[in-house]
Regions:
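Short hydrophobic/aromatic patches on the structural cores and recognition surfaces of FHA
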Residues: 77, 93, 107
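Conserved short histidine dyad/triad with adjacent acidic residue
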Residues: 30-34, 49-65, 100
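A short, N-terminal "cap"/entry segment at the start of jelly-roll beta-barrel domains
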Residues: 1-45, 130-167
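Ligand-binding loop in jelly-roll beta-barrel domains
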Residues: 42, 80, 100-127
Length: 167
């Protein structure tokens, strides 16, 4: 008997109860079934998850990352990817890249059946998520998440910071 993870996850065999019900805490239109794939298969440095999103819903909300690159691959169904101000129809077979510090993005299920997609990216202990629609950012750390109102945030140059000129 081995304690090694099975490197093959048969996603077609997954049942709804194998996933985690997920709602983004800042988006009332968020609803998804969230299936972790990379950890059960033994990956530690990258994450890959499968999301099943019902019609009219989205898994996350308009956001971008400052530390982690992200991607999505549509497996079933159809939806609309919002990337910046652009709204683009997506369907099975489409790959979408979300580069570091790129445009804010989200994927909405605009179809009539569940939208199933893989999403993943880098797995770092820290990340910063920016939510432009609500003017907030989240700092993801190993011990929790800090939610910051961007209206209260101040930006300093390196010269100001190191000179202690924070007034």
């Amino acid at each position: 008997m081995t304690d090694e993870p099975n490197p093959i996850i048969r996603t077609r065999a997954l049942k709804p109860e194998d996933g985690l019900p997920f709602r983004h805490p800042l988006n009332p239109n968020s609803e998804a079934q969230f299936f972790r794939l990379s950890r059960p298969a033994g990956l530690q440095r990258a994450h890959v998850n499968m999301l099943r999103v019902p019609p009219g819903k989205e898994a996350f909300m308009l956001h971008r990352h400052s530390v982690q690159e992200e991607w999505s691959y549509i497996v079933e169904g159809e939806g609309t990817a919002q990337i910046g101000e652009d709204r683009i129809k997506v369907s099975a077979g489409d790959f979408i890249a979300f580069p570091l510090n790129g445009k804010a993005h989200t994927i909405v299920n605009t179809g009539t059946r569940d939208l199933v997609y893989l999403t993943g990216g880098e797995d770092t202990p820290y990340d910063i998520g920016h939510f432009p629609g609500i003017h907030k950012m989240a700092v993801f750390k190993p011990d929790g998440i800090e939610l910051i109102d961007e209206g209260n945030a101040r930006t300093y140059s390196f010269q100001q910071w190191f000179a202690g000129d924070l007034g």
